[in-house]
Amino acid sequence: FIEHCQLEDAYGYTPSDFPDAQLNQLELDELLAAIKAKNLEAIYPLSPMQQGMLFHSFYAPESGVYVEQMTLKLKGDVNVAAFKAAWQKVVDRYSILRTLFIWENRPTPLQVVLKQVDLPWNNLDWRSFSTAEQQQQLSQLLTSQKQLGFQFNVAPLMECTLIQLSHDT
């Protein structure tokens, strides 16, 4: 029995692991099956503010009202691997960036914090576009990402896109 419990594949959770969620074993098992994740850190109810934000995100999903976008222009040689690793460390450090939300078939929504998630990362090469085309492409990309929004039941609720504009930007 002890050897089995020490196997990497052996895991299990009970309601006592997540007392704030107020789940029974059946509800916890259903939640685990829904998120297909073994690396749970915590399960919490949503704060009233989070409940309101989730409601408004579903009420008008195309509005992107809670989608924040940040653009930075980096000059010089960028070590892409180090830059990506630094952003991954930010996600690793802050639990809110490893959080997903479960609401379907639930009387009240829950937030689920995972121990580890991989930050979605995109690399784009726009060096062949003119400056005007780059601006147009960026505008279209930001608009489409904002309208697309997020899958709230998949962590993390963020992604990074690194766009190379020239040999040093």
Model-predicted segments: where are they?
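Acyl-group handoff/entry surfaces in thioester-processing enzymes
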Residues: 1-11, 38-120, 129-169
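C-terminal, charged and often intrinsically disordered regions of DNA end-processing helicases
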Residues: 26-44
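AMP-binding/adenylate-forming catalytic domain of the ANL superfamily
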Residues: 3-27
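Helicase-core coupling region on the C-terminal RecA-like lobe
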Residues: 126
